[in-house]
Amino acid sequence: MNNSKKNNRKETNNASSRVSISWYPGHMAKTMKQLETDLKLVDVVVEILDARIPVSSQNPEAQKLIKNKKKIVVLNKSDLANEIENKKWLKYFEEKQIPAILCNSNNGEGANKIINKLNEMMSEEKNIAQQKGRNKIVRAMIIGIPNVGKSSFINRVSKKTSMRVGNKPGVTKNKQWIRLTSNVELLDTPGVLWPKIANEQTALNLAYTGTIKSDIIDEVEIAYNLVKFLIEKYRKNLIETVSYTHLT
């Protein structure tokens, strides 16, 4: 995330114990190298973020690679996030001149906006190609950390369900091109983290949202931190949801 002082949004900090995560399977290291190579094949990067944790779900290593590319942000799983916060994040990216859309991959709401966004972003290049009698194919790369819903998003936008989708981090491991229209193509890439997640709050947020495999984290500690956070910030909602009357 761009750390400029102006309008630098942050997620709620509720870390109360030292938590850091190191989970970097061999295929992720290879993916980062391949991503750097494949960037030469595309015009635009479509970055899928978890709308609940937009900052934490950005891979800082990937940001270094794509910094000179045009980018569109998809705030996925928007139905699971706070509606007011969703609007604030859209404004945040807008002020940074980064096109952003909200998407609910469960029902497809918002997914169809991506094609128009891609065409708008590449309109100048398309016009130049048209003047030369050529049809410009807009090629975009989908990137995102594990479990942000990249495959579900692509299934919605391509109206297909053939892509293997799962709720476990790291399901997609092979590179795939998907044709959306006669002049828009997407290159899907596997989800990849960075070698060491040292920031305590980032580690917790990724654990809360299922990005980190459960066998490499202390589930009891993560659960304790999450419940503590919910009690502090959403006490009334928690009571109504789980009927924990002893919390009153």
PLM regions: where:
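G-domain G4 guanine-recognition motif of GTPases
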Residues: 48-51, 74-82, 103-109, 209
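Short coil/loop residues immediately preceding or within conserved phosphate-binding loops
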Residues: 137, 160, 175
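Anionic group-transfer/hydrolysis microenvironments
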Residues: 49-52, 78, 93, 157, ...
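Post-Walker A helix-loop "phosphate-sensing" segment adjacent to the P-loop in P-loop NTPases
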Residues: 159-167
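Helix-rich effector regions associated with P-loop NTPase G domains
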Residues: 2-45, 52-61, 65-71, 84, ...
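Glycine-rich phosphate-binding P-loop
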Residues: 140-159
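Canonical P-loop GTPase G-domain recognition
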Residues: 82-139
